[in-house]
Regions:
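Conserved catalytic cores of very large enzyme subunits
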Residues: 1-158, 175, 179-229
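Contiguous, well-ordered alpha-helical segments that form the cores/surfaces of helical PPI scaffolds
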Residues: 162-175, 195
Length: 229
């Protein structure tokens, strides 16, 4: 679990009610690198007015109108992620040898490979009985299923997500354009790649009713796996 501190109107400026807690949080971050921070103002703009923490270090659930609490608010607690498959954008760029047309062709091929990997993760969960982890599936941590009931219905319709991870946006731009993704000349290319990832997730989701989403892969262990390949 990640330690999260939410910056909001009642704690973000000096003189507000919880300013003293913000100061303590900042002091703690300076010494221990935690907590992490969420801007309630920005998150509300991006997440239909909702503010909620991430799962682990950075994985946020999607806001689903099909998943609501009894009070009419969007449901987040109890939902989960089915897994991640990461596309190596650096390898796509290197494999294209700097040829832009070839880059997009290889990107689409690799995205379909990732889709197959995500399907493997999803299908591995199908048919799992709630009995394998009663605390999770029967006693409310993730759901309240009956004994012997399979978890399949929780894998569709937005209850859980499954993530297309990406890595190497900076290096991809450097290989293709010789500029960083924050440079004015390279930014449109970087955004176009991210849009392609989003569009693919949307396409798969509409076809399968599985909540595919884009995820910034942390890469601590994935880097080693990529290097071995």
């Amino acid at each position: 679990p990640k330690l999260i501190y939410v910056l909001d109107e009642d704690n973000v400026t000096e003189g507000t009610k919880y300013w003293h807690l913000t100061k303590l949080a900042a002091e703690c971050t300076a010494k221990r690198m935690v907590p992490d921070y969420i801007s309630a103002k920005i998150m509300k703009e991006l997440k239909k007015g909702e503010v909620y923490p991430c799962m682990g270090c950075r994985s946020f659930l999607t806001v689903e109108d099909t998943q609501m609490n009894e009070d009419g608010r969007h449901k987040f607690y109890g939902r989960f992620n089915q897994g991640v498959v990461t596309i190596n954008l650096v390898d796509v760029a290197c494999s294209s040898e700097g040829d832009m047309d070839k880059f997009w062709e290889i990107l689409d091929e690799r995205l379909e490979l990732c889709h197959r990997g995500l399907r493997c993760r999803h299908e591995r969960l199908l048919g799992t009985a709630s009995d394998v982890a009663p605390i999770l599936w029967q006693y409310g941590a993730l759901a309240r299923l009956k004994k012997g009931e399979v978890i399949d219905k929780l894998l569709y319709n937005g209850y859980s997500t499954i993530s297309l991870g990406y890595a190497g946006l900076y290096e991809m731009c450097m290989r293709m354009l010789g500029k960083t993704h924050t440079d004015a000349e390279a930014r449109p290319f970087a955004l176009a790649v991210m849009q392609r990832l989003n569009d693919k997730c949307k396409e798969w989701r509409e076809a399968e009713n599985i909540s595919y989403s884009v995820y910034g892969t942390p890469m601590e262990s994935t880097t080693y796996k990529f290097a071995k390949c």
